[in-house]
């Protein structure tokens, strides 16, 4: 089993036990140990008051070395867990906290192999969707640039981003794309080609079209 969980004494108080969950191989254990477990156990101020107060202090930056998000649904929590985050569960509370502790093992940005450019930038998209969206934002710094995340695949839970310029992209087209993404009902997405089959029309043209 690669799923792991362990008890944490909040602020060193055995009466306030929390549960930390993560998937082995998906997290950097030194980050979990140094930036989550140790501060939670050693910061005695976190044990003062009730758990709701501790949640607020942790969410607002008590563990300042990590980004933290509050999750209120099981789908959000599971999505973060399989993405390399660790989850901190509080007994009797309906929320959990998600910490970014991923391994961050990914291919570096490099020149495209299939379509090498003759002029201009020589960086290409990689397997990390966050890296790809950051590449777009570096090249297109307009405040109108919008990035919306959708999740496709019942089993793979693959993130897919809709990126467009607000005020320039046709709102109806953006809406149709998002509706089609949300309507895709498959187990998993292996490549962008899988999405293209569901998003484009079957008209006789060499170019993919939105119906």
Placement of each model-derived feature along the sequence:
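Cytosolic regulatory modules rich in charged/polar residues
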Residues: 1-211
